[in-house]
UniProtKB/Swiss-Prot annotation:
Residues 45-72, 278-365, 414-461, 525-587, 610-768, 794-842 are annotated as: Disordered. This is SKI family transcriptional corepressor 1. GO terms for cellular component: dendrite; neuronal cell body; nucleus; transcription regulator complex. Expressed in brain with higher levels in embryo than adult. Expressed by migratory precursors of Purkinje cells in the postnatal brain. Also expressed in adult testis. Inhibits BMP signaling. Acts as a transcriptional corepressor of LBX1.
Length: 964
């Protein structure tokens, strides 16, 4: 291989000056590299620049005309494997051609005839029609159905390009550093110029420098630009519309080497429409994604990359932050500004198979992967210029999974310090990591060599190199640019979400160092206690604030609760740690976070994950960690705040669906909002984020309680809290401000009765409104609260809205609360409404009992009766509803069944008629065949008689006509 690499380098150097006889180069290689390495991939690796790289998945290909064209006999049938599918080939005019129809029916069977045709035209692939003989050969070979009337044949190379444009795998052609194609056109008086692939990063990029006037034109304008030289003839172009430039621009060197012409084809195919759908094809790395439509052959990578050539010359002076795209596996999406390590801009390239050229530091396998600092194309520039948060791409654009598939860009990853090929494609990041991390910035943090390590997309851990401290630091820095991995919303199982590697814990230390400040902020902002929770991330998250947020869903900072991803002020403070993948399987009600019905399922869901995060036992997070609160719900708890299993819900909601305190939503509306949000107060993460005394499980995770404004969807600015006091003296002030703050926060909305702040049952906040006789009750609750999750929050309705006079109802409520407590205790399951609220109706017997005993004394009997009646009515109502639902359902079932039977009958009828028709046809056909046969025989005999009576031996029943 070394030899070959060497060779690759040589070719590279020679390449520009003299297009020397392709044949000995290719022939030579063909013998060695090419065949040995099993395919184009290898070839590119050796021929580097010239060839397209991924061009052919595995081909022995048109090298044949060179190496042994003598071997090819006309109409010789062969079989070629294209993307692993055997395709019949036929030698036509000394060239092996593949059967397009067969390709369409196998590899491209998911695309319509039109799509295939249009793409073929766009790629400039001409189809050669078979002769009838060849068609018959193809039928016999099984490539075409017997009924086929014609078949187009395309060369293997064309077939590969066609399939590649559909099936992905877009690497821009590899071209040497300052390469330019010499092109000419003959429209009007013609002109010649240099097409500079490195500048060709969008369909309208001015990438052709006119040879006469040295001005730059886009390809479609260049064909209308001509210089009238003395000897020029005026040619009226047949179809010079702007987009036909691919037809009119030709390489001036007619005898260009194969690779050159192939590279030219690939470049031409680059922005050639075709696939609008690949606009963000995160395919070619950022490449496809970034180019504004990357399109066509999708050679996206190149495109976005700043042009196939991706020559970094093209980068001449863009601010480093345009971040390099590595030509080949392109950086993961346009990274955010990488100030963290400016050297990265070019450094990355080095890492990712360095600009140093084949031999260069990172130079992998001797191929230059031309990183390019794109001259941004439209879409791309847009993405980069917007402060990301305004532009969140649904799938964390920068890295999202488009990158995953390219895990093994063989060329690149080949020689690299395996930063973990895993990250390989992610912008060579892994590789870069090896290189001391300059590239790391490129990756989405998870992917960074550091914590998330190579595992970012592909499960495997980054190898040692990636874990260097340096790398980790870089990763942390990177993290500033990209949020930590869960780039996407908790899309349930579908994403390739690797389990977070253990590497995190190590990374933790370094990252912490890197982002000490951030971490501090984090502690303050308490985005879920990054430290305790997900070891590796603190730094990342903290630092996230400092850089632009990445436009990815993750960027939802603590505050954009509803996933609205509104523009986040960059300093948002740490993100909640990413959801531990295991949890992902749960069925999410909302796209953004689970509405978990009760604490136990939560424990189940996240238990394991949390352990991974080191946040302690399944339930109470480590009491010590101020922030630790029940691990932040992975899916971005409400504002990264309250701990998941908040203490028992406001119990009173048991009876009627109450409007949610914070956001005035009815329970059902709340589905989307994290259920923990209503309970943030209860977790003691009251807006102050003070922790209630007591159960660790309630410690707010540094929460600053939800701060949604009344309608719960415009995130309010986050309050920074001071480090949570370890324990507030019986939650006095907590409740007090809680209550106060909340009152001011949620204006009663329109018609609903707004249940007002829930102070912890009987915390002094509540005490303010109770009659003194409640005091002892209060104490008891304090105790209860201290006991465990059941710090039930009693919502005293309107207590603090002086304008509502029925404060007395506090008692009723209380009572409800109590009651529902007892209910719950007996049922040990959240009562229906609770479930509705999506709250964990987990109650502790202890508390329940205490409450009940204490309060039954305090409850007047009529109140109990009233309650009972309400409950009964409620139950009746529910039963009625249930009944009606059941009836509806049964009706529906009946209707369905009837419908189904009818369908079955109809199908039967259709089938019978079809069968009859078929029989008829068969008979008719048979009759016609008979007639034809008779006619044929008659003709045959007749001609026999006419021409050569002697051939027709006696068995001819035909009488010679009587002569006149």
């Amino acid at each position: 291989m070394a030899l070959l690499c060497g060779l690759g380098q040589v070719t590279l150097r020679l390449w520009v000056p003299l297009p020397f006889q392709s044949e000995n180069r290719i022939g030579f290689l063909a013998a060695g590299a090419f065949l040995r390495s099993g395919g184009m991939e290898a070839l590119t690796t050796q021929l580097g620049p010239g060839r397209e790289g991924s061009s052919s998945p595995n081909s022995k290909q048109e090298l044949q005309p060179y190496s042994g064209s003598s071997a090819l006999k006309p109409n010789q049938v062969g079989e070629t494997s294209l993307y692993g599918v055997p395709i019949v080939s036929l030698v036509i005019d000394g060239q092996e051609r593949l059967c397009l129809a067969q390709i369409s029916n196998t590899l491209l069977k998911n695309y319509s005839y039109n799509e295939i045709h249009n793409r073929r035209v766009a790629l400039g692939i001409t189809c050669v029609q078979c002769t009838p003989v060849q068609l018959e050969i193809l039928r016999r070979a099984g490539a075409m159905p017997i009924s086929s009337r014609r078949c187009g044949m395309i060369t293997k190379r064309e077939a590969e390009r066609l399939c590649k444009s559909f099936l992905g795998e877009h690497k821009p052609p590899k071209l040497p550093e300052n390469f330019a194609f010499d092109v000419v056109h003959e429209c009007a008086w013609g002109s010649r110029g240099s097409f500079i692939p490195a500048r060709y990063n969008s369909s309208r990029a001015k990438c052709i420098k006119c040879g006469y006037c040295s001005m730059y034109f886009s390809p479609n304008k260049f064909i209308f630009h001509s210089h009238r030289t003395p000897d020029a003839k005026y040619t009226q172009p047949d179809a010079a519309n702007f987009n036909s430039w691919r037809r009119h621009l030709k390489l001036s060197d007619k005898s260009a080497t194969d690779e050159l012409s192939h590279a030219w084809e690939d470049v031409k195919a680059m922005f050639n429409g075709g696939t609008r759908k690949r606009t963000f094809s995160l395919q070619g790395g950022g490449g496809g994604g970034a180019n504004s439509g990357s399109g066509g052959a999708g050679k996206g990578g190149a495109g976005g990359g700043g042009g196939p050539g991706c020559g970094s010359e093209m980068a001449p002076g863009p601010p480093p932050h345009k971040s390099l795209r590595c030509g080949e596996d392109e950086a993961a999406g346009p990274p955010g500004p990488p100030p963290p390590h400016p050297q990265r801009a070019l450094g990355l390239a080095a890492a990712a198979s360095g600009p140093a050229g084949p031999g260069g530091p990172g130079g992998s396998a001797g191929v230059r992967s031309y990183p390019v600092i794109p001259v941004p194309s439209k879409g791309f520039g847009l993405l980069q210029k917007l402060p990301p948060p305004l532009f969140p791409h649904p799938y964390g654009f920068p890295t999202a999974f488009g990158l995953c598939p390219k895990k093994d860009d063989p060329v690149l990853v080949a020689g690299e310090p395996k930063g973990g090929p895993g990250t390989g494609s992610s912008g060579g990041a892994g590789t870069a990591a090896g290189a001391g991390g300059p590239g790391a910035g490129h990756l989405p943090p998870g992917a960074g060599p550091g914590p998330g390590g190579g595992t970012m997309f592909w499960g495997h851990q980054p190898s040692g190199a990636a874990k260097d401290a340096a790398a980790v630091a870089a990763a942390a820095a990177a993290a500033t640019v990209y949020p930590t991995f869960p780039m996407f919303w908790p899309a349930a199982g579908s994403l390739p979400v690797p389990p977070y590697p253990a590497a995190q814990s190590q990374a933790k230390a370094v990252a912490a160092a890197v982002a000490a400040a951030a971490a501090a902020a984090a502690a303050a902002a308490g985005g879920g206690g990054p430290e305790s929770l997900d070891g590796a991330e603190p730094a990342k998250e903290g630092s996230l604030g400092t850089e632009e947020r990445c436009p990815s869903a993750l960027s939802r900072g603590p505050l954009d609760e509803d996933g609205a991803d509104e523009a986040l002020p960059p300093s948002l403070g740490p993100l909640p740690p990413p959801p531990p993948p295991p949890a992902r399987k749960s069925s999410y009600v909302s796209a953004f976070r689970p509405v978990v019905k009760d604490a136990e399922s939560i424990a189940k869901l996240y238990g394991s994950a949390r352990e991974a995060y080191g946040s302690g036992p399944a339930r109470g997070p480590v009491p010590g960690t101020g922030t630790g609160g029940g691990y932040v719900s992975p899916d971005f708890l409400s504002e990264g705040s309250s701990s998941y299993h908040s203490a028992s819900p406001d119990v009173d909601t048991a009876d009627e669906p109450e409007v949610d305190v914070e956001s005035n939503r009815f329970p059902d509306e709340e589905g989307a909002q994290d259920d923990t949000e209503p309970r943030a107060p209860s977790t003691g993460g009251g807006p102050d984020g003070d922790q209630p005394a007591g159960p660790p499980s309630v410690t707010s995770s540094g929460a600053d309680g939800p701060t949604d404004s009344a309608d719960g969807d415009s995130p309010r600015p986050r309050r920074r809290l001071g480090p949570p006091p370890a324990i507030r003296s019986a939650f006095g002030d907590l409740v007090a401000d809680d209550v106060v703050r909340r009152t001011e926060r949620s204006p009663p909305s329109g018609g609903y009765e707004l249940r007002e702040p829930c102070g912890p049952l009987g915390g002094p906040g509540a005490a303010k409104v109770y009659a003194p006789e409640r005091d002892e009750h209060v104490k008891s609750t304090a105790v209860a609260a201290a006991l465990g999750p059941a710090a039930s929050y009693l919502c005293t309705p309107e207590t603090h809205e002086p304008d509502k006079e029925d404060n007395h109802s506090t008692t009723a409520d209380d009572l409800e609360t109590r009651k529902s407590f007892s209910d719950q205790r007996s049922v040990s399951q959240p009562s229906p409404a609770n479930t509705d609220r999506g709250e964990d109706g987990l109650t502790l017997d202890v508390t329940g009992t205490q409450l009940v005993e204490k309060d039954i004394e305090n409850l007047a009997r009529e109140e109990l009766q009233k309650l009972l009646l309400e409950q009964m009515e409620l139950r009746k109502k529910l039963e009625r509803e249930f009944q009606s639902l059941k009836d509806n359902f049964q009706d529906q079932m009946k209707r369905e069944l009837a419908y189904r039977e009818e369908m079955v009958q109809q199908l039967q009828i259709v089938r019978d008629t079809l069968c009859n028709e078929l029989d008829q046809e068969r008979k008719a056909r048979y009759a016609i065949q008979q007639k034809l046969k008779e006619a044929h025989d008659a003709l045959h005999h007749f001609s026999c008689k006419m021409l050569t009576p002697r051939h027709c031996t006696g068995n001819c029943s035909f009488k010679p006509p009587l002569l006149p």
